[in-house]
């Protein structure tokens, strides 16, 4: 890696692999990270340091449960730029966080067991299909 010259380094991963790609990118000068369904990786200070030096494109599919762990009360944060995939497969860059919170709370109040419905949204095949469709539209 020291001899990479002017070549750009990219890291990517899904789920825990996404967390590992973020940690790897944080240790590589100028690395760009793409992750899909990634859990929260670090503290607020880690996130700020990462965002200052690196780029991360974080994709979250609708109700995917993994990006919601560890819980916020444990003070873990997401780094990078959120690309949210809604239930219709549309991708929105950095959607309004209050709206996202409202949707989540509303879903939990309607059906507390609905959190289990986030498990199928973690499927990497869905991420691949939605992101590929989005790229083909551009």
Range-by-range predicted roles:
Residues 1-12, 16-138:
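Non-catalytic, mobile gating and regulatory segments of ester bond hydrolases
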